[in-house]
Amino acid sequence: MSYELQRPGEEMPIEEQMARTSLFTRLEDLVAWSRKNSLWPFNFGLSCCYVEQVTALTPVFDQARFGAEVIRASPRQADLLVVSGTVFHKMAAPLLRLYEQMRAPRWVISMGACANSGGMYDVYSVVQGVDSFLPVDVYIPGCPPRPEAVLDALILLQQQVGAQRRPLGVTVGNAAGLGFEAPRRRDQRRDERMAQTLLDPPEKL
């Protein structure tokens, strides 16, 4: 970037002014860029993995560098849900309700072995993978994962969000508004996944 001095009152050609002060891009690229760089996580934790998630917010790891430091206390103000810890069957229905209260577009990170696959708790009361009832975008392995893994997952999610070209949901004239949600593979088995909120007998696990 080059700098040059300009005297007060000196006129600059309009083309040069526009080149210095204006940015030209497509609207969908601008929206994708802003979503990518301003993820708002929902303040939600279930177990020991949540401690590592909060550690990523400390100055040592500085999650603010990635634009995801604004932790929201309400799901209606968040667009990122990090499921960190053991998900019990009793917690599945409230967790799904919190996810449904988040505004679209929204994303889910499954953090830790327990959230990914039930971990070492292969018992009747633990959901064997949060992806059985939520659409997961990024998985973080580990028991518990290190804060660096949380930052890696954020970077990976930002790359996915930046590459998505979702409709903006604008209504023009008599046209119907376009939705935000991109089709997901797990929607084909949605009814089967929604049944996960009920306790299964131990012999089915």
Curated annotation (Swiss-Prot):
Q: Which NCBIfam families match?
A: nuoB_fam (TIGR01957), PRK06411.1 (NF005012)
Q: Where is this region: Disordered?
A: 184-205
Q: What is its EC number?
A: 7.1.1.-
Q: Which family does it belong to?
A: Belongs to the complex I 20 kDa subunit family.
Could you identify this protein by its name?
Answer: NADH-quinone oxidoreductase subunit B 1
- Membrane topology annotation: Peripheral membrane protein
Residue numbers binding [4Fe-4S] cluster: C48, C49, C114, C143
InterPro entries per the UniProt record, alphabetical: NADH_UbQ_OxRdtase-like_20kDa, NADH_UQ_OxRdtase_20Kd_su
- Which function does this protein serve? NDH-1 shuttles electrons from NADH, via FMN and iron-sulfur (Fe-S) centers, to quinones in the respiratory chain. The immediate electron acceptor for the enzyme in this species is believed to be ubiquinone. Couples the redox reaction to proton translocation (for every two electrons transferred, four hydrogen ions are translocated across the cytoplasmic membrane), and thus conserves the redox energy in a proton gradient.
| One BP term from GO | electron transport coupled proton transport
Q: Which cysteines are joined by disulfide bonds?
A: none
- The protein's assembly and partners: NDH-1 is composed of 14 different subunits. Subunits NuoB, C, D, E, F, and G constitute the peripheral sector of the complex.
What remark does the entry make about the cofactor?
Binds 1 [4Fe-4S] cluster.
Keyword annotations from UniProtKB, A to Z? 4Fe-4S, Cell inner membrane, Cell membrane, Iron, Iron-sulfur, Membrane, Metal-binding, NAD, Quinone, Translocase, Transport, Ubiquinone
Q: Where is the composition biased (Basic and acidic residues)?
A: 184-194
Which Pfam family, giving just one, matches this sequence?
A: Oxidored_q6
Task: Output the Gene Ontology terms for molecular function.
Answer: 4 iron, 4 sulfur cluster binding; iron ion binding; NADH dehydrogenase (ubiquinone) activity; NADH:ubiquinone reductase (non-electrogenic) activity; quinone binding
Required co-factor(s) are: [4Fe-4S] cluster
Query: Which reaction is recorded as catalysed by this protein?
Result: a quinone + NADH + 5 H(+)(in) = a quinol + NAD(+) + 4 H(+)(out)
Could you state one GO cellular component term attached to this entry? respiratory chain complex I
What compartments host this protein? Answer: Cell inner membrane
